[in-house]
């Protein structure tokens, strides 16, 4: 028999952000759930568009996450930063991959000590002086953020191509960043974004002055992407993801005019104007945080492909829920372990499984439910009184065998993810 699962219920000021950590339960059903319960219409409530949190409360929650260091307020950044702080950020960004030779594979071969040292050394950490000039820049395309300055994948198995240990996250085009350092060969820039630090391709950046940069970092007028993806044609096609913020305004004829980033030959930012029809993929400002908006946004990405760290033009479990809440004005941390720290913990030890499920009944739809290394969005109970979630899942275990799904699905909580 399996050991009793231990739960914790995460309680906070906002009911919409109640969340629970759930460890493995015995598998009783294969993923995913299909049928009516796997549609947005099943969970929408007629007329239920009352905000669960006001825009002010959403902004306050974002500010609290900044105060706790879970996300970054890059708009208040200084012009110079202590070199020691930048060195510490670079080491932290490596997430342990620079401490000892990891047992990983590159191009199907075991990673060698020489290759590992070469990549770590290319960070040129010893060249960082007492103070570093903080340079504002904007990404000009969807851009990988890497733990070390290399675009070669490091994988835990020789034939793996999906779970790159160096892939941190991705940024949308037009994402304001702070450039703090460069790799020895100049190919990579070490940047701080609103939710991450890491190495990006220097050619994906366009440098600009602070005032122009602020128009991307904190635009007064902007649109939010409400579909899984938005592609904008141009010299280089721009791919934006759910929740992305694009500076722009609406013209008198109802058309949407966007400010799009372009890098000139000298590496500087040129703002290109793009015109799009108002076809429902963009909304002015942020959406209100309501039950129905939560449901619509969550289901906008149903069955889209899972992408570890944003690879394959996809999302992973934590960026999926981050993007949903971002579209409604709440900035959450990027990674699941940091998202868990958004709220305080109330242990539920000593309760039976039935009592814990009863406690789950008090959790509102839209709550984030956590398991080790995984986060899900709670939908509620179906007609058969079974709690269901929607999540971007890579795999689960059935009879000890790992089953890969790699997409956004609706499911029960009766699965093992480790």
Regions found by a protein language model. Give the residues of each.
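Bacterial N-terminal signal peptides that target proteins for export
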Residues: 3-14
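Bacterial N-terminal signal peptides
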Residues: 12-24
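Boundary regions of SH3-family modules and the immediately adjacent low-complexity/disordered segments
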Residues: 30-146, 152, 162, 178, ...
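Low-complexity, Gly/Ser/Thr/Pro-rich intrinsically disordered linker/tail segments
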Residues: 32-47, 392, 396, 400-418
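Conserved beta-strand/loop element in small beta-rich adapter and peptidoglycan-binding domains
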Residues: 63, 160-183, 235-252
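Second-shell loop/turn segments in exported
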Residues: 161-164, 280-285, 303-312, 356, ...
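...with weaker cross-activation on analogous glycine-rich loops/strands in unrelated enzymes
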Residues: 170, 333-400
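Active-site nucleophilic cysteine motif
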Residues: 308-338
């Amino acid at each position: 028999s399996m050991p009793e699962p231990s739960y914790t219920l995460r309680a906070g000021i906002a009911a919409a952000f109640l969340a629970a950590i759930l460890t493995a339960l015995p598998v009783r059903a294969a993923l995913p759930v299909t049928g009516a319960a796997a549609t947005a219409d099943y969970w929408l409530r007629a007329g239920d568009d009352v905000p669960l949190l006001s825009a002010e409360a959403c902004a306050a929650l974002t500010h609290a996450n900044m105060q706790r260091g879970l996300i970054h307020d890059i708009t208040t950044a200084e012009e110079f930063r202590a070199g020691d702080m930048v060195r510490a950020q670079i080491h932290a960004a490596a997430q342990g991959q620079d401490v000892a030779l990891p047992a990983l594979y590159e191009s199907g071969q075991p990673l060698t000590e020489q290759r590992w040292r070469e990549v770590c050394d290319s960070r040129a950490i010893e060249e960082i002086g007492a103070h570093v000039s903080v340079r504002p820049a904007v990404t000009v395309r969807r851009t990988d953020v890497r733990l070390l300055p290399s675009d070669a994948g490091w994988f835990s198995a020789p034939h793996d191509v999906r779970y790159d240990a160096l892939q941190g996250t991705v940024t949308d085009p037009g994402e304001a960043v702070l450039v703090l350092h460069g790799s020895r060969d100049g190919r990579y820039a070490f940047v701080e974004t609103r939710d991450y630090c890491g190495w990006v391709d220097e050619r994906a950046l366009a440098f600009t002055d602070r005032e122009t940069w602020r128009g991307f970092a904190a635009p007064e007028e902007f649109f939010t992407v409400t579909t899984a993806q938005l592609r904008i044609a141009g010299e280089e096609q721009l791919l934006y993801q759910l929740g992305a913020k694009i500076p722009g305004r609406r013209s008198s004829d109802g058309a949407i005019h966007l400010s799009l980033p372009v890098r000139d030959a000298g590496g500087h930012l040129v703002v290109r104007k793009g015109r799009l029809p108002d076809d429902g993929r963009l909304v002015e400002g942020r959406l209100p945080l309501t039950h129905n908006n939560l449901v619509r946004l969550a289901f906008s990405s149903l069955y889209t492909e899972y992408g570890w760290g944003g690879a394959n033009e996809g999302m992973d479990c934590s960026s999926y829920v981050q993007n949903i809440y971002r579209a409604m004005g709440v900035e959450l941390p990027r990674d699941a372990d940091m998202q868990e720290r958004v709220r305080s913990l109330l242990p539920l030890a000593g309760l039976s499984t039935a009592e814990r499920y009863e406690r789950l009944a008090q959790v509102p739809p839209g709550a984030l439910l956590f398991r080790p290394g995984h986060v899900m969005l709670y939908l509620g109970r179906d007609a058969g009184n079974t709690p269901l979630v929607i999540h971007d899942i890579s795999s689960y275990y059935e009879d000890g065998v790992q089953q890969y799904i790699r997409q956004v699905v609706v499911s029960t909580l009766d699965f093992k993810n480790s």
